[in-house]
Structures are given as structure tokens and as C-alpha cells.
Amino acid sequence: MSSSLFSYVVLLIFLFTIPYIQSQPTAPAPTTEKSPINLTAILEAGHQFTTLIQLLNTTQVGFQVSVQLNSSDQGMTIFAPTDNAFNKLKPGTLNSLTYQQQIQLMLYHIIPKYYSLSDLLLASNPVRTQATGQDGGVFGLNFTGQAQSNQVNVSTGVVETRINNALRQQFPLAVYVVDSVLLPEELFGTKTTPTGAPAPKSSTSSSDADSPAADDEHKSAGSSVKRTSLGIVVSFALFCCSVIYIA
């Protein structure tokens, strides 16, 4: 009898506590905040990108990358030339560029979309960069290689280099190491001479004096003078002979 009463009491307690338990708010699941991606920290970890970091800072392109990375759903692909790549440039190459051209050079190393190495081989050349459209230029990159070996080359029309290891290859950012600075054809291509430009003219006196036609004219004039003088001498001699004969 006592055991039945005890069971009945336990059942009542259970029935009364169920509504209370159901009314309690469910604790929210812990949220994982996505930390912003720091491009400078990624490059510093590579230990060979001092010049690139300096250019990204002075041109403010590094700040632009940070903003876009944390606001775009397309991701981004960056090609990072090593310090040795910059050292291979002709002396004064960077200093010869204007501030705007330095910005274009940095933007040329950035594709506004995330690409894995295999994706680059499937991309339609030329692939647009962040510099595309500036000053009406194409500023595109061309990719070739072999999918089997995962080897990819990038060409600008001025230089071609192999894409080496990745400092990062996880959406939304891929950072690939390159051993040459990607020089855009719009800034470093062969400059042609404007058509229709008049050829330089030399002075008339010197050209006339040195030309074969001028020499012929001088010779012709000299011959004419000689023939005239000879005719006068012959005529005078005949005149003298006729006077002597009459006398």
C-alpha cells in the first residue's frame, strides 16, 4: 500500500513539472564569429614578401583587399611576387612609375574571384583583374598548364612565370607565390611610334649639295661654261685670220 502511494506521488510530481520544463527557453547555440582575414599577416608568415607588403600599404590596395574580402561573396585570388622577384626588375623600374601606375600594378596581381589552381586552367583567357578597365586597358591574365600535374603558368604578354606553392588556398582567399612580378602590357609593353609622323627634314643646302642630282647640275654648268669659252676663242681666231687674209 505504501509503495503504491509513493508511486502515485512521484507520478503527480512528474506531471506537474513537465509544463515548467517545456516553458523554459532553449539556450541558443554558441555562434562562431568569422574573424576577418588579414592579408598582411599571411604574407608576413611567408617571410619573403617585404617589398610587396610595402607596396600594398603605400598604395592602400591592402586596405581595399581587406574591405572586399569581408564584404564580397565572390572571394579573391592574389598573386604574390617574392622579394627576389622584385630584385630581378631593372633598376629604377618601380620608381619610374607614377603613384597611379603603382596602384594599377598592385591591382593587376589581384583577381576579384576565388580560384583554385585547377579552376585557373578552366578559366576563359584573358581573366580580368582588379585593374581591368582602368585607363581603358584590358589588364588581363592568361593561364596555361597541365591539369594532371597541377602545374599552372601565368602570362601577361610581357612576362610568363610558373605559379608556385599557395600561402593560402581556402575560400574566400587564395594567395599564390610567383617568382616574377606580373608586368602588365598596358604599362610595360613595347611602345610603337605614332603613324603619320613627318620624317625629319635636313637642310636644303646640305641635302642639295650632297645629292647626286646636285653634283650633275654642277658638272653640267661647268661643261656649259667651258663650251662657251671655247666657242669664243675659236670665233676670235677665225676673225683674226680673216683680217690677215684681207690685208
Curated annotation (Swiss-Prot):
Q: Name one GO cellular component term.
A: side of membrane
Q: How does it sit in the membrane?
A: Lipid-anchor; GPI-anchor
Sequence similarity: Belongs to the fasciclin-like AGP family.
Q: Which organism is it from?
A: Arabidopsis thaliana
Give the keywords, sorted: Cell membrane, Glycoprotein, GPI-anchor, Lipoprotein, Membrane, Proteoglycan, Signal
Q: What does this protein do?
A: May be a cell surface adhesion protein.
Query: Where would you say this protein principally sits, based on its record?
Result: membrane
Residue ranges of region Disordered? 192-221
Q: Does the keyword Zinc apply?
A: no
Task: Mark out the compositionally biased spans (Low complexity).
Answer: 192-212
| Matching PANTHER family | FASCICLIN-LIKE ARABINOGALACTAN PROTEIN, FASCICLIN-LIKE ARABINOGALACTAN PROTEIN 13-RELATED
Glycosylated residues (UniProt): 38, 57, 70, 142, 153
Residue stretches making up the FAS1 domain = 36-182
* Lipid moiety-binding region (GPI-anchor amidated glycine): 222
Output this protein's name: Fasciclin-like arabinogalactan protein 6
Subcellular location(s): the record lists: Cell membrane
From the UniProt record, list the residues forming the propeptide.
223-247
Q: Which Pfam families match?
A: Fasciclin
- Signal peptide extent: 1-23
